[in-house]
Amino acid sequence: MSLRFALTPGEPAGIGPDLCLLLARSAQPHPLIAIASRTLLQERAGQLGLAIDLKDVSPAAWPERPAKAGQLYVWDTPLAAPVRPGQLDRANAAYVLETLTRAGQGCLDGHFAGMITAPVHKGVINEAGIPFSGHTEFLADLTHTAQVVMMLATRGLRVALATTHLPLREVADAISDERLTRVARILHADLRDKFGIAHPRILVCGLNPHAGEGGHLGREEIEVIEPCLERLRGEGLDLIGPLPADTLFTPKHLEHCDAVLAMYHDQGLPVLKYKGFGAAVNVTLGLPIIRTSVDHGTALDLAGSGRIDSGSLQVALETAYQMAASRC
């Protein structure tokens, strides 16, 4: 039996539904289930001029074979309000979270080998009165996972984050021995178990410019990061650093590593997105399930226009397929 995967279209007024439909033009190697409003997909297909055959499926009768080119399996999930491309509506916030819940729970229950997510709009979900900081945190709660790690990857580069969506002024206080220990262990374990890398080598960024310049530009490297890395090396983790980020992100260093651990969001991700924007994938590590996502946002201004590239979603699909194969 072929592995099944769940696909969530994210914000209904954004480009997520468009991406799902564009992918359906080509056959996939595994059954791919779009957890979405059938009405939304029908309307968006008409706006895009796409002739996609939407095939209804449900937990009572999952497909065993991949859909053909021009077909898309849909687990219908009703909207609360009609959708106009590019126009956010907080009434549909619960719909977005329902698609994620169905996909995540389906993975936990063994219905899906992994889930692939299109972008959501955090702001409109919070405006609806639902606290929401992102896919990563939502899925951690759903799966009762205490610690997860956000990693983005493109060809030749993987970057994981010690901290994610924090104001910059709060980052230094968040870099603790406990946090770094958990993040490094998760990164090491998932590179081995989900990516099939037997002995992962990880480069670790310092927090401060020049990795603190021997304590003259900050002491986090001396007091927190270096002692933590040294102790983890004693557990068998191959950790290089802390290194100055502007030195670490050079070919000399990157060609000899499997992943980079950056201390904060905008330390590591600008480099990765410059290298591979449109062909990068967001992976949530530490979960008991496989979850990958695109590397871009909802692009409300492009929804329904046909002027989008589905490359990142295709990479997210391929990465999920590869990760699932590594676990089999």
Swiss-Prot record:
Q: Which GO terms describe its biological process?
A: pyridoxal phosphate biosynthetic process; pyridoxine biosynthetic process
Please tell me the species this chain comes from: Pseudomonas aeruginosa (strain ATCC 15692 / DSM 22644 / CIP 104116 / JCM 14847 / LMG 12228 / 1C / PRS 101 / PAO1)
User: What NCBIfam families would the database entry show?
Assistant: pdxA
Q: Which reaction does it catalyse?
A: 4-(phosphooxy)-L-threonine + NAD(+) = 3-amino-2-oxopropyl phosphate + CO2 + NADH
State the gene name recorded for this protein.
pdxA
The record's subcellular location field reads: Cytoplasm
Gene3D superfamilies cross-referenced by the UniProt entry: Isopropylmalate Dehydrogenase
Query: What more does the entry say?
Result: The active site is located at the dimer interface.
Which named protein is this?
4-hydroxythreonine-4-phosphate dehydrogenase
* Binding-site list for a divalent metal cation: 165, 210, 265
Q: In which pathway does it act?
A: Cofactor biosynthesis; pyridoxine 5'-phosphate biosynthesis; pyridoxine 5'-phosphate from D-erythrose 4-phosphate: step 4/5
Q: What Pfam family is a match, any one?
A: PdxA
